């Protein structure tokens, strides 16, 4: 199967003047945002640094293999260094914020693609518990702090940089990209050529009905793999494009697993049954709870995980035995009101899962009868 690495081999020598920026370029930059830029870049610096220089600096780090998030990240750095299409692009305004008190995890960077054309790229969820907590907060509050920061970042970039804009991001970064484009203002929206959302969650009906969202909707391109979970959360007014991934279920969230055909992904007609099941289950589950109930459930789970004293999911996995013991102890020590809230939410989830499974089975039977 051909992936973005094959694309870099085939098309990595073509300048944007010969082959304009498109969806595969966007996913490469969205993936690039996850690199540990804090090791080699000054935050908020407006001094341009080329992609090649940043990649070389990262590859020179003695611990780069463990500093990156995905196995393919160092391969991407090496490929970008050798790519005439990308290596001359300039990076500015690296932003990175992690705040436990406001439960905010936000990072973005601006890429000068060519003269008069810039890409604002947002990072998705990192490995921190705070980052995941902000994700879950989206289920009961909007905007979360990261979404507000995303709007502010895009507005500042647009004021500073003349010309065309492209906005992109993966996972929560895709959600931030769409939210920022929807609420940045009409003048900036007119300069936006495309918004690329790679398997990022959607929004509640209030956001989807906002004039700013409706105005930018036709420029949004949302891509989800066939077993998408994250990208199917909440609502999407824009049409989403289903792409083929060689991985299974949650592993399909990894864009390195997406199949690329020349300058497009390999498109599919529909998501698979597992994605439909999760979609039906979670939407029904959330619909049965008030925002306050969702918040109480999420806060309770987060507090239990926080008692492990781990700051990242990786730390929890490394010390899984101690983490499990701490989680069990914290769960036992829940006050009665919280325990009842968690039990109630878990019961609703189980009921929604049963209904979701039945709905998928009935749909399959109906398809066979056609």
Question: Where do the protein language model's features map onto the residues?
Answer:
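Alpha/beta hydrolase fold serine-hydrolase catalytic domain that processes acyl esters and thioesters
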Residues: 1-118, 122-164, 185-370
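Gly/Ala-rich beta-loop-alpha elbow adjacent to hydrolase catalytic centers
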Residues: 168-173, 177
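Short glycine-enriched nucleophile-adjacent loop
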Residues: 177-186
């Amino acid at each position: 199967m051909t992936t973005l690495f094959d694309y870099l081999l085939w098309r990595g020598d073509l300048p944007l003047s010969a082959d304009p920026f498109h969806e595969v370029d966007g996913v490469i930059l969205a993936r690039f945002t996850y690199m540990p830029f804090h090791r080699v870049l000054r935050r908020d610096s407006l001094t341009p640094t080329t992609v090649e220089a940043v990649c070389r600096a990262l590859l020179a780090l003695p611990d780069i293999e463990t500093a990156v998030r995905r196995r393919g990240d160092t391969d991407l750095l090496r490929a970008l260094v050798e790519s005439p299409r990308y290596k001359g692009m300039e990076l500015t305004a690296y932003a990175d914020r992690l705040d436990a008190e406001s439960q905010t995890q936000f990072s973005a960077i601006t890429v000068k693609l060519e003269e008069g054309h810039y890409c604002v790229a947002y990072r998705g969820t990192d490995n921190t518990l705070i980052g995941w907590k902000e994700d879950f907060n989206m289920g009961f509050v909007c905007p979360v702090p990261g979404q507000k920061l995303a709007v502010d970042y895009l507005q500042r970039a647009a004021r500073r940089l003349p010309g065309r804009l492209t906005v992109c991001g993966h996972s929560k970064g895709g959600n931030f990209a769409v939210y920022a484009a929807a609420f940045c203002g009409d003048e900036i929206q007119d300069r936006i050529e495309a918004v690329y959302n790679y398997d990022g969650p959607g929004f509640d009906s209030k956001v989807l009905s906002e004039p700013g969202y409706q105005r930018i909707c036709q420029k949004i391109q949302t891509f989800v793999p066939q077993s998408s979970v994250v990208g199917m959360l909440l609502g999407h007014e824009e049409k989403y494009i289903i792409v083929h991934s060689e991985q299974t279920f949650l592993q399909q969230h990894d864009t390195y697993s997406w199949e690329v055909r020349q300058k497009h992904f390999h498109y599919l007609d529909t998501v698979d049954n597992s994605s439909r099941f999760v979609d039906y289950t979670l939407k029904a589950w959330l619909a049965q709870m008030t925002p306050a109930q969702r918040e109480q459930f999420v806060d309770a789970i987060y507090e239990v995980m926080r008692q492990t004293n781990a700051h990242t999911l990786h730390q929890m996995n490394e010390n899984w035995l101690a983490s499990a013991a701490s989680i069990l102890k914290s769960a036992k020590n829940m006050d009665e009101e919280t325990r009842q809230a968690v039990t109630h939410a878990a019961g609703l989830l189980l009921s929604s899962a049963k209904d979701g499974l039945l709905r998928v089975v009935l749909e399959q039977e109906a398809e066979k009868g056609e």
